[in-house]
């Protein structure tokens, strides 16, 4: 029977690197019986390489704004193309991290279940998990960095209290997915670079779908999604609160702060939680994590490192944040000065042309003749 390989993230586990790998190695995948479709429809802020996004549709829309008829039409068109691919290939690969947080909220799994009932293909779900505190911080960091959302101004404390759409009960979510596809059809991998097959997420994913990488495969050396340092993240969060902030300025702020974050200095020695806070936060998930290790990772005694060691808790206003703030505003000032100089030069040139109209016309005639020759 044909196999649909569905990679569902979770978010913040190098999903883009996996998707680019599948896209860039389409020809080699095809030779080994796999196909990675790239569909023609586009969703806001979603790369086309996220080819399973049709299962959840536009996640930015509220329930009232959604068009179920349009979503169903796209779903049927997508599966029409998938069934055509199955005529030539034994395996079709789909990938989108939104299925983890939104799959049940927006009926993606229910739609998939109906297709499975047709008994045309079997399914293998691949999911990467990272420790809940690390996942939450990485998620918050990304939301703040992107900006332009209500949640982009959340403090760390607010994020922990509200956790919008984030599914941290890994075991509970896996059990719901298992009810649709069967537990035996779920492959759980730890998002831990030290444990990846071949020391690379691409090689590890290939192993998860039954492939062994050969020398011909391309792995993009730089699929960068730079996380802001904790200090730069706090600066960006405060900037997100500015009234009248538009996309152009938001992108500019993000660019500068991402540049600063490329030199993280001692950022890694800080944690957003103290050791007691970390233990309390993780205590909610320890039993579920233990059961995942027992039921999905046969032979492993635990899912994540549970030593919970913390060097220092990060606090706003520390010396690194002061340095980042000074650097950021220095970069903005230099950029404005440079732009001002360019405008002054343009104004000077324009004034000269206005004061010497005949010379300006003569120069244009000379230039046009040179071009004609």
State the predicted function of each range.
Residues 1-373:
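Anion-recognition interface
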């Amino acid at each position: 029977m044909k196999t649909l390989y569905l990679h569902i993230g979770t978010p913040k586990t190098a999903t883009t690197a996996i998707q680019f790998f599948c896209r860039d190695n389409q020809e080699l995948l095809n030779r080994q019986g796999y196909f990675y479709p790239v569909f023609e429809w586009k969703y806001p802020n979603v790369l086309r390489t996220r080819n399973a996004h049709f299962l959840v549709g536009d996640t930015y829309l509220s329930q009232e704004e959604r068009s179920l008829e349009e979503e169903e039409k796209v779903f049927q068109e997508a599966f029409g193309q998938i069934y055509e691919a199955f005529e030539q290939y034994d395996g079709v690969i789909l990938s989108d991290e939104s299925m983890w947080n939104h799959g049940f909220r927006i009926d993606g799994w229910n739609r998939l279940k109906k297709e499975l009932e047709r008994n045309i293909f079997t399914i293998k779900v691949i999911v990467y998990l990272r420790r809940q505190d690390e996942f939450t911080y990485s998620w918050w960091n990304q939301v703040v960095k992107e900006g332009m959302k209500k949640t982009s101004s959340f403090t760390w404390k607010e994020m922990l209290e509200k956790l919008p759409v984030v599914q941290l009960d890994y075991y509970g979510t896996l059990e719901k997915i298992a009810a649709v596809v069967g537990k035996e059809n779920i492959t759980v991998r730890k998002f831990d670079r030290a444990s990846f097959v071949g020391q690379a997420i691409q090689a590890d994913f290939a192993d998860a779908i039954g492939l062994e990488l050969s020398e011909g495969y391309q792995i993009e050396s730089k699929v960068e999604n730079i996380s802001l340092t904790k200090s730069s993240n706090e600066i960006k969060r405060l900037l997100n609160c500015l009234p009248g902030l538009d996309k152009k300025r938001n992108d500019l702020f993000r660019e500068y702060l991402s540049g600063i974050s490329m030199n993280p200095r001692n950022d890694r020695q800080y944690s957003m939680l103290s050791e007691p806070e970390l233990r309390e936060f993780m205590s909610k998930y320890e039993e579920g994590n233990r059961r995942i290790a027992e039921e999905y990772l046969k032979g492993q005694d635990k899912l994540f490192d549970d030593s919970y060691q913390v060097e220092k808790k990060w606090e706003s206003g520390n010396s690194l944040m002061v340095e980042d703030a000074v650097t950021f505003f220095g970069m903005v000032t230099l950029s404005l000065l440079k732009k001002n100089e360019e405008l002054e030069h343009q104004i000077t040139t324009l004034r000269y042309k206005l004061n010497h109209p005949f010379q300006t016309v003569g120069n244009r005639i000379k230039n046009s003749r040179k071009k004609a020759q």
